């Protein structure tokens, strides 16, 4: 049975997904960067219907009371915080950052990303895998940003990742999902949730990710850099729902030739 498809008896209203023992109804995760202010960020997260928000521990103010605090706007009582290691280019930096996050907020469900270079922000998969093993040994529940390589996705799951998060395209590029085949293979082989992480630019990109069978979509720039972030957040919410519904419904088979909607027999 495909772990990413609920039993047929489950209605759309009851459809949910679970990661590290925590169950969520919304399949849209949003970031907390690039917004003009925290108030806009909070409004967008609510418009998206998100239950999880990612937080770049090294960039977002969580503790300095002399500056605006994210927690005063995007409240931890309303959202599940997912600390991440954005901006880390070595495994050591990533592990250190998440240790600090756990000390500061008690978070053990975290997102690991170890970047290879500033130009592409592609994940360094060797460093990612090495860091994952260390974090798992320390009791972290790790969701992992990774390449769209099915082999590495399997290795990450075997090493203890609680979710696999392959990029759709480079972070912040808005190019949409570039390799649907690999993403589909990752989904079919995975025993943990698979989330598109990075590259979504507009609503159709989010819908495609869900149509491919992904459990959820994570995005930041697509909403934050839209001309109207709140409206785009709403659009993304509906796109994720539509894509999920289409995946569960099962699309028609593609055909080379036409197949009339109305029978041709018995015509006047």
From Swiss-Prot:
UniProt pathway: Cofactor biosynthesis; thiamine diphosphate biosynthesis
Chain positions recorded as 1-deoxy-D-xylulose 5-phosphate binding sites: 172, 198-199, 220-221
Main location: cytoplasm
Catalysed reaction, written as an equation: [ThiS sulfur-carrier protein]-C-terminal-Gly-aminoethanethioate + 2-iminoacetate + 1-deoxy-D-xylulose 5-phosphate = [ThiS sulfur-carrier protein]-C-terminal Gly-Gly + 2-[(2R,5Z)-2-carboxy-4-methylthiazol-5(2H)-ylidene]ethyl phosphate + 2 H2O + H(+)
Alphabetical list of Pfam families matching this protein: ThiG (PF05690)
GO cellular component: cytoplasm
Record EC number: 2.8.1.10
EC supergroup of this enzyme: transferase
UniProt superkingdom: Bacteria
Keyword list, A-Z: Cytoplasm, Schiff base, Thiamine biosynthesis, Transferase
Cellular compartments annotated: Cytoplasm
A molecular function (GO) term: thiazole synthase activity
Biological process, per Gene Ontology: thiamine diphosphate biosynthetic process
Active site feature: 111
Family membership noted in the UniProt record: Belongs to the ThiG family.
Known partners and oligomeric status: Homotetramer. Forms heterodimers with either ThiH or ThiS.
UniProt function note: Catalyzes the rearrangement of 1-deoxy-D-xylulose 5-phosphate (DXP) to produce the thiazole phosphate moiety of thiamine. Sulfur is provided by the thiocarboxylate moiety of the carrier protein ThiS. In vitro, sulfur can be provided by H(2)S.
Protein's name according to its UniProt entry: Thiazole synthase
Provenance organism: Caulobacter sp. (strain K31)
Gene: thiG
